[in-house]
């Protein structure tokens, strides 16, 4: 192989890598134990607020599950974050050995506190959710899908990945199993908190189900 051909192939390869986002210059990658706990706690606290009927304009939830951290989902989300591309992961790649479909929330920003900022931003979509949408999910209208995935009753597992690039932008990808946001399906069953739990109430979050 001559030098010119070798150089051409190298340039093409680098173009493919950078174009796919894999050429991102990562300053920080991954989540430590405290960061994982922060993300999980923020999600469950938000879910409990809604389940207990403490969120203005939202009915209480009879069957909303407590979320648990899942390392396989987190590894999947980390791979997506490391592309440094602010786009949802292809649905065909959002699955694990247990879950055939994972929901996903994504965030990009240059603020120094990406975890609380992203979770709060997703949750803030609650202002556009009506009891009618809780009863029958619809994606038409204002953006609400980040919030509705956060509080989807049947979702039980969470895993996230984080990258901070050299341009100071952070990319946080969170994936949820099983995924939610199914059109015409209820986000959760309306009723007294944790009144329709199949396996009892959570000991840490009594408004949520095990």
Curated annotation (Swiss-Prot):
The keyword tRNA-binding does not apply. Expressed by the venom gland. It is found in: Secreted. Contains 3 disulfide bonds. It comes from the Eukaryota. Keywords: Calcium channel impairing toxin, Disulfide bond, Ion channel impairing toxin, Secreted, Signal, Toxin, Voltage-gated calcium channel impairing toxin. InterPro entries: Allrgn_V5/Tpx1_CS, CAP_dom, CAP_sf, CRISP-related, V5_allergen-like. SUPFAM superfamilies: PR-1-like. Pfam families: CAP (PF00188). Belongs to the CRISP family. Venom allergen 5-like subfamily. This is Scoloptoxin SSD976. It comes from Scolopendra dehaani (Thai centipede). The lineage of its organism: Eukaryota, Metazoa, Ecdysozoa, Arthropoda, Myriapoda.
């Amino acid at each position: 192989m001559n030098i010119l051909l070798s150089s051409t192939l190298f340039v093409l390869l680098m173009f493919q890598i950078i174009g796919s986002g894999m050429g991102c210059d990562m300053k920080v990658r991954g989540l430590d134990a405290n960061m994982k706990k922060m993300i999980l706690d923020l999600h469950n606290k938000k879910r409990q607020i809604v389940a207990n009927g403490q969120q203005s304009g939202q009915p209480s939830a009879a069957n909303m599950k407590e979320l648990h951290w899942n390392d396989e989902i987190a590894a999947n989300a980390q791979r997506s974050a490391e592309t440094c591309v602010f786009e949802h992961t292809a649905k065909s790649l959002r699955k694990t050995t247990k879950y055939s479909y994972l929901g996903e929330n994504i965030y990009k920003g240059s603020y120094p506190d990406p975890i609380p900022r992203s979770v709060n931003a997703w949750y803030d979509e609650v202002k556009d959710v009506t009891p009618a949408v809780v009863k029958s999910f619809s994606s038409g209208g204002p953006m609400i899908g980040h919030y509705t995935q956060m509080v989807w009753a049947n979702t039980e597992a969470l895993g996230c990945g984080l990258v901070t690039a050299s341009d100071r932008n952070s990319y946080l990808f969170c994936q949820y199993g099983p995924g939610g946001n199914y059109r015409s399906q209820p986000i959760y069953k309306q009723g007294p908190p944790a009144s329709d739990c199949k396996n009892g109430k959570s000991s840490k979050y009594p408004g949520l189900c095990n």
